From Swiss-Prot:
It comes from Agrobacterium fabrum (strain C58 / ATCC 33970). This is Adenylate kinase. It is an enzyme of class 2 (transferase). ATP binds at residues 10-15, 127, 178. It comes from the Bacteria. The lineage of its organism: Bacteria, Pseudomonadati, Pseudomonadota, Alphaproteobacteria, Hyphomicrobiales. Belongs to the adenylate kinase family. One of its GO terms (molecular function) is ATP binding. Monomer. Residues 30-59 are annotated as: NMP. Pathway: Purine metabolism; AMP biosynthesis via salvage pathway; AMP from ADP: step 1/1. GO terms for cellular component: cytoplasm. Disulfide bonds: none annotated. The keyword Heme does not apply. Gene3D superfamilies: P-loop containing nucleotide triphosphate hydrolases (3.40.50.300).
Amino acid sequence: MRLIFLGPPGAGKGTQAKRLTDKYGIPQLSTGDMLRAAVSAGTEIGKRAKAVMDAGGLVSDDIVNQIVSERIEAPDCAKGFILDGYPRTVPQAKALADNMRKKNQVLDAVIELKVDEEALIRRIENRVAETIAAGGTVRSDDNPEAFRKRLTEYREKTAPLSAYYSEQGELVTLDGMADVDAVTEAIERVLEKASA
């Protein structure tokens, strides 16, 4: 099972990916984790990424695409994987399609979790209030203003992927505002249909 989750921050992609990882035994691959692993392993591409990051730059699509391409060949990805935070742009999506085609792999599903952004902001505000009331530390990215900025960035940079995957006939859109269990069940129905 090879799967991509799309949706804005706070839509529940991480929660759903964890559930699928636990159930199917396939890895959730995040761009950040893959970059850190490549740098830590000292691979050639990891060294290139480290040089860019050490200089304070953004790692290029070419480097990210190569790291993802190498990672999806790892033995733990033999049964599939869930991509989290990749692709972020249409050029990355096209590079992924090319890489997978060369490996005779296909995506089983691209699932977009649609959410109401104002409801998401209220959800974050409530989470912050609950964390403060419990005496906990608020995550820096849970600041409502920072969260709004992440939503704007998502709309501008990542949202065009929905149109791209829709044109490819690969996009399935689900209600990310539904109960967590209901979303999981809907995702599993999509995956059953894809593997039939």
